[in-house]
Amino acid sequence: MSDLFEDPAPSRNTPEFTVSELSGAVKRVIEGEFGLVRVRGEIGRVSRPASGHLYFDLKDDRAVMAAICWKGQAGRLSVRPEEGMEVVATGRMTTFPGQSKYQIIVEDMAPAGAGALMAMLEKRRAALAAEGLFDAARKHPLPFLPRVIGVVTSPSGAVIRDILHRLRDRFPSHVLIWPVAVQGEKCAPEVAAAIRGFNALPEGGPIPRPDLLIVARGGGSLEDLWGFNEEIVVRAAAESRIPLISAVGHETDTTLIDHAADRRAPTPTAAAEMAVPVRLELLAGLDGQVARLSRCAAETIRRRDQRLRDLARALPRLESLVAGPSQRFDLWSGRLSGALGQSVAARRARLEPLGAHLRPRLLADLVARQKDRLGDRTRSLETCLGRRAERARDRFDALSARLAPAFARLIAETERATRRDAATLGTLAARLDAAPEARLARLSDRLEALDRLRQTLGYRETLKRGYAVVRADGAVLTTKAEAGAAAMLEIEFQDGRLSVGRGKTRKPKEEPPAQGSLL
């Protein structure tokens, strides 16, 4: 019975290992048997320590495997590992003897199918929308007529050719192309750098700053367009101070940059159509506005002129206004002559008695006294004026000393302004002199073109090709009946005219009777 509870003695032929030796042997077997493998599973328990390495689990409904992605490789992963995401990890199997567990060193990672990509895309879209990156309040209006357009796309391919062709057809503009990769690992960082690079250009620098940006790419699968779903691209588009049009893929393709852009275009060609209007339509609209303005101005002038005529007819005639005052003037002028004579006679009669009382001596004394008083006043006034003039001269000298620098600056500024105005006037004069000559040249070219068209469409060019014009009594004949009724015909050829008299009408030759049938 005791044998049932005792372990059998180990065989002396079984090899003996230390723990380290056995762990190393297991490590060599696993690394040799499972070199490079691809493992599909759900990510769980993601850890990102300060070292930069990435630790997580790959699991399914029956097993869990530890996974490691070193710092240098973690930054190059196309997918950012998140808990709950289903992925396919590519890497090499190994063991960690310190904890007696096996694990996979991940070198690459991709979502497990389109469903996983769509789930990750929706989760990322919701997170970015919660931050307000897709709010309508952040959108910028597109400029009506941008001078410079920046295009972020691949420099080769049909996309850039379609955009340039459409811009050239609608309204030629200055286009700056920032070449980027439009798929793959380099796509997202290069597109984000291009958007930020255009925004960093200074106003008035050697490279003109665009007024509008177009981010464009042709159609493709969800994986091909994934670079435009990356968070770095979406944030760069949302932060752009320059209005941005997203034209990624076809009309059915939707990426996250479409939500962050100020406007989404279904195709790159449509983006070019959104960017600029049609130049010919603008010119036609401008011509229509000018024509309407001219008609409105002419109608306004006509109505004002008619109103003036109506008011003029309502006013009284000038002769009727002047007739009454003129008659009164004649009446009063006759009366005034007699009244003046009577007034002079009455005043002379009053002055004659007074003149007898006036003596020359009294007048001379009065004049002498007034002259002495005037001399005293003059001397006093001269003294006072001298003192006031001296004080005024002192104040004037002080003010002159204070105002001299200001006058000097004013004179200098006036001279500079005069030189600038003279330069501006010279430029305007040159432009004014050149404008009539340019207009005269354009009108001359148009006149020559119309003259060539007149010569081409004239009937004399037709005569050179063998035709002739038939006239009778100065009128052109167009039918056989008119020619038969005319007595004299005049035929015009290329080199002159020929008169032809009507000859004797020949009787048409009768056709022989048809031979009857012998049967």
Curated annotation (Swiss-Prot):
Residue ranges of the region described as Disordered: 500-519
InterPro entries in alphabetical order: Exonuc_VII_L, Exonuc_VII_lsu_C, OB-fold_nuc-bd_dom
Entry keywords, A to Z: Cytoplasm, Exonuclease, Hydrolase, Nuclease
MF-aspect GO terms: exodeoxyribonuclease VII activity; nucleic acid binding
GO cellular component terms given for this protein: cytoplasm; exodeoxyribonuclease VII complex
GO biological process terms on file: DNA catabolic process
Family assignment from sequence similarity: Belongs to the XseA family.
NCBIfam families xref list: xseA (TIGR00237)
Assembly and oligomerization: Heterooligomer composed of large and small subunits.
Protein name: Exodeoxyribonuclease 7 large subunit
Biological classification of the source: Bacteria, Pseudomonadati, Pseudomonadota, Alphaproteobacteria, Rhodobacterales
Name of the gene this protein is made from: xseA
